[in-house]
Each structure stands twice: as C-alpha cells, then as structure tokens.
Amino acid sequence: MTGAPTPTRWAGVPLTDRRAERRALLVDAAFRLFGDGGEAALSVRSVCRECGLNTRYFYESFADTDDLLGAVYDEVSAALAADVEAATAGAGDSLRARTRAGIAAVLGFSSADPRRGRVLFTDARAN
C-alpha cells in the first residue's frame, strides 16, 4: 500500500513564519503550565510535550526556561497594559475615575484568568 506522503505540519509555511508559530506555541504552553502549576511545572520537556514540539524547536527560540518565562511574562504584561490603557482612556478626565478604572482593569484581568495573576504576581523568577 503506497500512497502519497502526508504533508507535514509546516509544509508550505515560510521559515520565518514557522519559527514565529513554534515560538508562540511554546509561549502558550509555558503560560498554561506555569499558570496551572507554578514554576515547578515548567521544564523544557514539559513545555515541548504540552505543545507537541521537540526540544530542538525549544532551543531555536529560547536559551532556557528563564528566557521562556520572560517571554510569557512579557506577553501577559503587554496584554494587561493594553487593558489598563483602554480602561483609563475611556474613564474620562478625572484622575479619580481613571485610577479606579485602571485598578478595576487590573483586578478584572487577573480574575478573568487566574493564571495571568500567577504569572504576574506570584512564583515568577526575576526577569
């Protein structure tokens, strides 16, 4: 039984796009693992297993798990900053209203997905 070879996951995807996609998969996997289980759940193998990539692709994007965790932190903090900026921009000119909107945005951001709070406020290594 000979058939045409099955296309690979990355067939037809340009190299730079493949790398970016794999990096995003690794960051998302690390977010889930760290967010659910803390730093103890994070290893090169666990991240690669979580996203279905081999370790070669891990080291294509990151030097070590500290580097990866920094990327997770950067992504989550950028999302928080965007939420706070949007909330404060829509709160009017009053400093009090803008402050309340910013605080509410931080609390809402963390409570909407508690893993975000864990990444930002607990367990995190110094990055």
Where on the chain are the PLM-derived regions?
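Short, basic, alpha-helical segments at the C-terminal edge of helix-turn-helix-like DNA-binding modules
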Residues: 73-81
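Hydrophobic alpha-helical connector segments
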Residues: 71, 85-115
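Charged catalytic carboxylate motif
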Residues: 25, 79, 98-102
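A short, mixed-charge helix-start or loop-turn motif at secondary-structure junctions
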Residues: 8-15, 62, 66, 87-92
